[in-house]
Amino acid sequence: WARTAETGNPDSRILHTAIFSLQQMSSGGLFDHLGGGYYRYSTDAQWMIPHFEKMLYDNGPLLQLNLQAWTITGNTLFKDAAIETADWVMREMQSETGGYYSALDADSEGEEGKFYLWDPESVAAQLDDSEYALLASRFGLDRPANFEGHWHLHACLDYRDLAEKFDRSDDEIRTILQTARGKLFAQRAQRTHPGLDDKVLTAWNGLMLRAMAFAGRQLDNPAYIDSAARSADYIYRHLWKNNRLLATSRGDQAHLNAYLDDYAFMLSGLLELLQAQWDSKWLSWAQQLADVLIEQFEDKNSGGFYFTSHDHERLIQRSKTYNDEAIPSGNGVAAESLLLLGYLLAEPRYIEAAERCLKAAWNSINQAPISHCSLLEALDAYLDPPQLVVVRGTSGELKQWLQPAFGKFMPHTCVFAIPDDALLPPALAAKSISDSVVAYVCEGMQCSPPISSSTEWRDLIADNTASLQQPNR
C-alpha cells in the first residue's frame, strides 16, 4: 500500500484488508483485553476463541504492526493494543537479567484458558454497577457464554456505540472501562498463572527487541528502548561466545550452535535499536554478526543462506528456504538487514551478499510472491534503497531534532541519531558535526548536501509522510 500511495494512486483495497484484519484481531478474542498480548491463533471463524498460548515470536511483529497501523490511521485501538502488548512483555516476559522468555502456556490447573475466563457473577463482584454495565456491554458478558460455559472477553461494541448507548462521552467511557479492566486484572493476578516457558531463544529475542526498540522510538518511551537494550545485552553476554552465537539458554546454561534465523533476526533487531538509541557497541556487534552470516551461512556457489552454518554437524541435506512461515524468512531478514548495514557503512560486501541472495531466491519468489513477503521487502530495499538519514549533534540537540519524527509512518526512511562523541568507523565518522546539528540524507551510496536547518528537517519529514496518511485521520 505504501508504495502505491507514493505514486499518488494508493490501493485502498489492500490497506483496508490489512487494517480490517488487524482491527478484528485487536478487538476480538485473539487479544488479551486485560493483560495485553496476543494468543497464538483462533479456533473459530469469528476469531472469538483462541488457543490461549502466547508466543514471543507472534507478539513482536504484531506489536510493530499495530504501531504502523496507528501511525497510518490515527486509530487509537492500535496504539492501545501496542502499548498493552509492550507492557505485558516487560511485566511477564522479560527476565531480571534482560532476556525475553519464549511463551506462556495455554493451560492452568490442567484446563485450557482457565486463567483468562470469566462469568458475569464474578465480574460483577469486582465492579460497581456502572462499571459492570459498561464492561458487560463492551466485552459480551451480557450475551451467552462463548467457551465451555464461561466467558472469554472480546469487544462487541466500540466506544462510539457505548457512548451512544450510555449517553456518555468517549473519554468517560474509556476512563470507566480502564478502571474496570484494572480491577479485573488485579483479581485475575491472584489466580494460578499459566506455565512459563523460560527458555531464552536468540532468534525470538531478535524479533522482540526490534519491536520494543521500534515502539520506544514511535511512542517516545525510553522504557521500551531500555527493555530492548537489556535483551541485546543479555544475548551478547550469555549467548555470544568466541565470536559466534548460541541459539538458546535457560538459567546459566547456553547451548546449541546458532542458526540463520538467530543471526538474521539479531542483526535486524540491532539495526532497529541503533535507530532508537545509538550505541557504537551495537554497530560493532552488528558488523560481526553480518560477517559470520556471510562467512558461515552463505551458499558460495548459488547465493542465499543455508539454515545451518558450514561447520555445523553434517546433515543429509542442508536446508535453504526462502518462504515465510510462522516467523519471517531468515533469508529475507538477512538480505534486508545486510542491505541496510551496507548502505549505512558504505560497505559493498554486505550489499553484494544481499544481491546474491535475492538472485538465488528469485524463482521461488516468482512462483508464490505472497509467501515471500520478507524477501519482497528486501527486494524493494535493493531496487529502491531506503532514505537513510544520519543526524549528528549533542545528545540534547538530537532529542529535540528527532521529536517531529515520533509517531510518523516512514517505512522507507531510516534515521540514525549519532552523538558527537561516538566512536565510529570511517564512513560514518566522515559525516561530522559542525557548530550545530546536521543531518546527512542518503539513498544507497549517494548523499545530498547536509541539512542544518530545523525547518528543512521538518519539511523533509513532511515530504516523507504526506502521501502515507489516511485522509480521515
Task: Describe these PLM feature segments.
Residues 1-473:
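Glycan-recognition and catalytic cores of secretory/periplasmic carbohydrate-active enzymes
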